[in-house]
């Protein structure tokens, strides 16, 4: 047994079916270990003879074998998992398509199961096929589509569109363009198209180019040069082995025979360095001149390449044909050594495929057995109970999501309405204040003209009723104020109407995912699950536009042939759920809604709201460069609500009619609010006037008290001995003058007799006042003087009008 391992001698293998090789080819066992032989006898390839018959013609096709080898190198397969890369650097191979586990036997089985109609999705590429599909043929086609298009959004139903687009742009494969469904083509033509797709990926896809540069050893096949007579070197033949089990391909390179009339040489000599492609020449007429001449070799290279043609001929297609070819060419030392190195590799590869197919067949048999077996009533009841629990859980989860969506939408609408109300309320007060100032100024001018004086006009001078706090100016502005009476949102009211039995206010406008359908209610009733929702949701959409108020509400349907809302931007009011034309919205509405955003200086546009376009809007649109974008998948639901943006991605929209209703609501409460404000202002004014009067009265009393104190302080002292004839009841006692400043002597009054206190200064003694000798005055003259003093005390003068006279003692 040979122990040499090369590119073809990978230490893995596959099983060999009984009768795959005749008795003359039993010599291969000498090159395989006994362990592998024992496992090959234990594991047999299922349907090996049937598959060999089906692919007999297809296996001789070079494109088919190339596709098999290419898929083995890019998917997780025997080649990528067991190939030893130590000699090329690294210890493992990272597959390009890690999510696909490829084997030739499994792939061919799935291909013919798809074509023979055993697959339930036969000829049905409209069914969405994902990476978890069981059919390997579908998964590989989907992966090729993603690699060709350069993104992962393509689907198998877009196969013809994307593939034909790339084939038309390629001159080498433009003849493969077809309008027939891919699965309806012949199996050989299908692999021709797949081969062309692989070639386009190799030329254009950068991801594959990087993978090829890092794993070049996978695409370097074992090859041996054949020593056949090539008639003077015009042909060169070689034999190389593909990763496919037992596939040997002969490569023949033909060259054009060099003749007298042919300008093509069998050898191509071109310089490697750029400096050898440039010639320097100097002009003898011009001194010190240098001219650079670049030699052109492109024509020679193109001619040489056109003189060479390469043909690929599949010599063996499976394990048995390879052993037969080996037995026939044992006389050739090169072929014998080449094949003997491949025998252990292919044997282990067949064992790998046999185990993989056996496990897959076992899983399929178990699945069919579980499906067809007779189940007990207890298990059936348990499954029904589990299904009921799952259905009930899904139902209540849907109700929770539905309720959460409604609450979230109502919250957004409530916030928007509150902001709009605040703006409308401020604008109403601004309009009212403007009219109030104008009316007040007008009345003031009229009063000036009537009175002919410059007396200012006071609001409080107008007569007002006690039960009505509004003044005449308020009443005049409320009745005929030009600015206040004009509507902020000028829009005509809608025509009240119904759409059959449906009221426009009863449309919930919920997305289809949150709508309750009759089928769901029937299914819940079958399982006996109680639900508070007894009626399905109405999924109709109502159209009524303020630009056409004469039209009654109508139902929007996808098949309605009308230009009223087809191919026109539509927007739905989030408050009344009526669909309207976007272009019919008053600019005042957009300006008002823009003022409620975080950046009021930015005016909202159509793309900021959930605007949709009904009907086919692709006729006037430019096509995208990406082929999968030219035919966008149609929306499953034709409801306008399902086409709009989610609530979190667009601004809340309130229509003109709803804002007009908000304005009317605010106008209804404006007069009561104004009365409250005026009553409060009147009360505040009365309080200010009362406080002012109290302050003035307090000040007057304080001044009166000060004058009384001053009057009492300047009254003369009365002594009983000096004025014996005066009444004691009207004369203050001497005790009242104990604290009087003795340095001050009031001036004598000619109208009354006042005592003058004299001072005598003695050294070392205190100053003691001495009463002078008062003249004798009659009782009749004293009484009028006392009455006059009492009258003066009863009518005190202003402090500024009183004159006090003090007589100071002379200074010695």
UniProtKB/Swiss-Prot annotation:
Residues 673-714 form a coiled coil. Residues 627-638 have a biased composition (Polar residues). The keyword Magnesium does not apply. GO terms for biological process: chromatin remodeling; regulation of DNA-templated transcription; response to heat. It is found in: Nucleus. Residues 1-21, 614-646, 679-704, 762-812 are annotated as: Disordered. Residues 769-796 have a biased composition (Low complexity). Residues 683-704 have a biased composition (Basic and acidic residues). Its main location: nucleus. Keywords: Coiled coil, Nucleus, Transcription, Transcription regulation. GO terms for cellular component: Isw1 complex; Isw1b complex. Present with 7520 molecules/cell in log phase SD medium. Functions as a component of the ISW1B complex, which acts in remodeling the chromatin by catalyzing an ATP-dependent alteration in the structure of nucleosomal DNA. The ISW1B complex acts within coding regions to control the amount of RNA polymerase II released into productive elongation and to coordinate elongation with termination and pre-mRNA processing. Component of the ISW1B complex, which at least consists of ISW1, IOC2 and IOC4. This is ISWI one complex protein 2.
